[in-house]
């Protein structure tokens, strides 16, 4: 495995070396091409510089010739001016001579003078013209012609030279542009040459590193090959010796009597095996050390490469830090602007006028009479917590609690209707007989409740609902509304009546049920049943008794010591509803509404006079509402 890995590494190194050499040769060829281009550009530049020098020399020669021509022109101008001055002098002299001749002629006769003058004039004109012509033709005309010819030739030469100068200037501009282009190309080529030099240097470094690694790997390979050969030869020798010793030991063991030589051979065999194991361990340690050295060398090289990469990354990090600082400054500026905008927004919001006051709170929600029934059921299930519930009864309930209690009460009542209610026995001896006024109200309420509970067990109750009169329902509604007004006024002054009034308001008015219960009640018969001796109460272990048809419950009032929720009826200002506890009482026979009416129809009116109407209506309303909830 090691030899195959080493061969693979050698192949990789050779391939990398060949790639580096090929890249190096390509770069060298490109460098030579760029050098040739640079030499050509230099030659062109030198030729352009030579042409520029020649043009400069020619321009200097032309300028010298132009200066010479200008000097010659100035000389000719001076000669012409001197010739003109001589001509003017000669004209003046001729005029003076004419005047003198005129003076001499004046002494002669006029005819002679006129003739002579005419002759003289003609002669003088001819003489002057001839003298001028002679003067011009002889002395100056040649010079003037020569000068004119020279001026024309000089002007032509001047024009030619001006044209040549313009051409030379345009050529100079072109040459200068070419030189600038050459310089730019030279700079570009120099930059490319520098880049290629850097690439060549990198390639040289890489090639050097590759060559060094290749040489090191070759040295390590040779060392490992030598060590492997030595180890193989040593192992083969030891294997041969071990086989010899095994044979000798086998022969000695075959012999029946062990000799001293056999013991010595065995001892030598043991020693040799120990030496073999020690040398094998040393060989393994050496191999491990060599492998660690190779790994360390590779690690050093990797560390060097990683350091170079770290330097590059640090430079990138510095650039990124600068960008980060700039972005942070921008973010701070933006935050500052955002804070200012938020302050402005807050100021604008603060400056807005305050909102109008909230509307007044809504009136308290109408309480539920089911809550009283729930409290009774809870007292039955949790008698120990009656005191805490009594303290909480004075606090006003919210709408959410009322709805929860309604739901719980309905669920519990449905469960009790389905499964049956386990009622506890009543201890009649523990009833305190104090305050006769309150006992009267309690008895009347109990009578009414018992009669209503009896009517619920009859099958004829559903039929009686259909035969109700609208007049009775209307009168019952009016009576209930009047009673509620009175109880609201009374409970506003008493702390115990707040819950009762709130509960009584939450239940909807059931006029039909109240009318049915009113027509069905016979107070005298109910009172007689209540006062009649009750059957023996069951023991706590017996449980509820099964009745034929249905079970009715007896309504009792317990003192505050046992229940903690007894209420008093006061004739004057304070009124409150009694807390009802349902106790199991086995009825002998289910009485219908007709049977109750047949017993004593005359006692209903007599009992109405004894019981106060307001307390009576409260108890009836409570029984009706509990009855409706059970339904």
UniProtKB/Swiss-Prot annotation:
Polar residues biased stretches: 456-465, 490-505, 550-561
Biased composition (Pro residues): 352-369
Coiled coil location: 7-353
GO cellular component, one term: lamellipodium
Places the protein is found: Perikaryon; Cell projection, Axon; Cell projection, Growth cone; Cytoplasm, Cytoskeleton
UniProt PTM: Phosphorylated on Ser-101 and Ser-249 by PAK1 through a CDC42- and RAC1-dependent signaling pathway, which enhances its association with F-actin retrograde flow in filopodia and lamellipodia of axonal growth cones. Phosphorylation on Ser-101 and Ser-249 is increased by netrin-1.
Highest taxon above the source species: Eukaryota
Assigned keywords, A-Z: Acetylation, Cell projection, Coiled coil, Cytoplasm, Cytoskeleton, Developmental protein, Phosphoprotein
InterPro entries: Shootin-1 (IPR024849)
Residues with Phosphoserine modification: 3-4, 101, 249, 375, 473, 494, 506, 515, 532, 534
N-acetylmethionine, modified sites: 1
MF terms (GO), sorted A to Z: actin filament binding; cadherin binding; identical protein binding; kinesin binding
Compositionally biased region (Basic and acidic residues): 403-418, 590-631
GO process terms (BP): actin filament bundle retrograde transport; axonogenesis; Cdc42 protein signal transduction; cytoplasmic actin-based contraction involved in cell motility; endoplasmic reticulum polarization; netrin-activated signaling pathway; neuron projection morphogenesis; positive regulation of axon extension
Region spans: Disordered: 343-511, 524-566, 579-631
Record has Transcription as a keyword: no
Gene3D superfamilies named in the record: Vasodilator-stimulated phosphoprotein
Modified residues (Phosphothreonine): 487, 496, 537
Comment, domains: The N-terminus region is necessary for interaction with actin retrograde filament flow and accumulation in neuronal growth cones.
Subunit structure, as described in the record: Interacts with L1CAM; this interaction occurs in axonal growth cones. Interacts with actin filament retrograde flow; this interaction is enhanced in a netrin-1- and PAK1-dependent manner and promotes F-actin-substrate coupling and concomitant formation of traction forces at axonal growth cones. Interacts with RUFY3. Interacts with PFN2. Interacts (via N-terminus) with KIF20B; this interaction is direct and promotes the association of SHTN1 to microtubules in primary neurons. Associates with microtubule.
Family: Belongs to the shootin family.
Functional description taken from the UniProt entry: Involved in the generation of internal asymmetric signals required for neuronal polarization and neurite outgrowth. Mediates netrin-1-induced F-actin-substrate coupling or 'clutch engagement' within the axon growth cone through activation of CDC42, RAC1 and PAK1-dependent signaling pathway, thereby converting the F-actin retrograde flow into traction forces, concomitantly with filopodium extension and axon outgrowth. Plays a role in cytoskeletal organization by regulating the subcellular localization of phosphoinositide 3-kinase (PI3K) activity at the axonal growth cone.
Official protein name in the record: Shootin-1
Gene it is expressed from: SHTN1
């Amino acid at each position: 495995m090691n030899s195959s890995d080493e061969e693979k590494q050698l192949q990789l190194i050779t391939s990398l070396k060949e790639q580096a050499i090929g890249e190096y040769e390509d770069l060298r060829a490109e460098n030579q091409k760029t050098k040739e281009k640079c030499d050509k550009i230099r030659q062109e530049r030198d030729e352009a510089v030579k042409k520029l020098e020649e043009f400069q020399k020619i321009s200097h020669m032309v300028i010298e010739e132009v200066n010479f021509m200008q000097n010659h022109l100035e000389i000719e101008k001076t000669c012409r001016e001197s010739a003109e001055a001589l001509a003017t002098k000669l004209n003046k002299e001729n005029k003076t001579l004419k005047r003198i001749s005129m003076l001499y002629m004046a002494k002669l006769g006029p005819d002679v003078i006129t003739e002579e003058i005419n002759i003289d004039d003609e002669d003088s004109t001819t003489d002057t013209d001839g003298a001028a012509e002679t003067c011009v033709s002889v002395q100056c005309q040649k010079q003037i012609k020569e000068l004119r010819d020279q001026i024309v030739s000089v002007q032509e030469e001047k024009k030619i030279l001006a044209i040549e100068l313009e051409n030379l200037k345009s050529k100079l501009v072109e040459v200068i542009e070419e030189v600038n282009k050459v310089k730019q190309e030279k700079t570009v080529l120099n930059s490319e040459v520098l880049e290629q030099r850097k690439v060549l240097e990198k390639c040289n470094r890489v090639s050097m590193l590759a060559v060094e690694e290749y040489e090191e790997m070759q040295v390590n390979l040779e060392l490992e090959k030598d060590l492997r050969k030595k180890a193989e030869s040593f192992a083969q020798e030891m294997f041969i010796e071990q086989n010899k010793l095994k044979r000798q030991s086998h022969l000695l063991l075959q012999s029946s009597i062990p000799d001293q030589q056999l013991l010595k051979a065995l001892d030598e065999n043991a020693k040799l095996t120990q030496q073999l194991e020690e040398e094998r361990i040393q060989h393994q340690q050496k191999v491990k050390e060599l492998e660690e050295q190779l790994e360390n060398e590779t690690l050093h090289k990797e560390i060097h490469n990683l350091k170079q990469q770290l330097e590059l990354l640090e430079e990138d990090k510095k650039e990124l830090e600068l960008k980060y600082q700039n972005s942070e400054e921008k973010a701070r500026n933006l935050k500052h602007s955002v804070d200012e905008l938020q302050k402005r927004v807050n100021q604008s919001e603060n400056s807005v006028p305050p909102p109008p006051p909230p509307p007044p709170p809504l009136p308290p929600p109408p309480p539920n009479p089911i809550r009283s029934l729930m409290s009774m059921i809870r007292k039955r299930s949790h008698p120990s917590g009656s005191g805490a519930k009594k303290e909480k009864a004075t606090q006003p309930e919210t709408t959410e609690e009322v709805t929860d209690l309604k739901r719980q009460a309905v669920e519990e009542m449905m469960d009790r209707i389905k499964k049956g209610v386990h009622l506890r026995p009543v201890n009649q001896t523990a009833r305190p007989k104090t305050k006769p006024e309150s006992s009267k109200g309690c008895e009347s309420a109990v009578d009414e409740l018992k009669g209503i509970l009896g009517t619920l067990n009859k099958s004829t109750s559903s039929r009686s609902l259909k035969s109700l009169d609208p007049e009775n329902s209307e009168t019952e509604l009016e009576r209930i509304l009047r009673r509620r007004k009175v109880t609201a006024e009374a409970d506003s002054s008493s702390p115990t009546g707040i819950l009762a009034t709130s509960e009584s308001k939450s239940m909807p008015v059931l006029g039909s049920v109240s009318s049915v219960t009113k027509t069905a009640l016979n107070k005298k018969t109910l009172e007689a049943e209540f006062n009649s001796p009750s059957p023996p109460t069951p023991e706590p272990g017996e449980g509820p008794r099964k009745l034929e048809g249905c079970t009715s419950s007896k309504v009792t009032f317990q003192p505050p010591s046992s229940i903690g929720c007894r209420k008093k009826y006061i004739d004057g200002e304070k009124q409150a509803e009694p807390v009802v506890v349902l106790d199991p009482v086995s009825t002998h026979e289910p009485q219908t509404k007709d049977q109750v009416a047949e017993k004593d129809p005359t006692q209903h009116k007599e009992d109405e006079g004894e019981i106060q109407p307001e307390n009576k209506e409260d108890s009836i309303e409570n029984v009706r509402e509990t009855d409706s909830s059970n339904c």
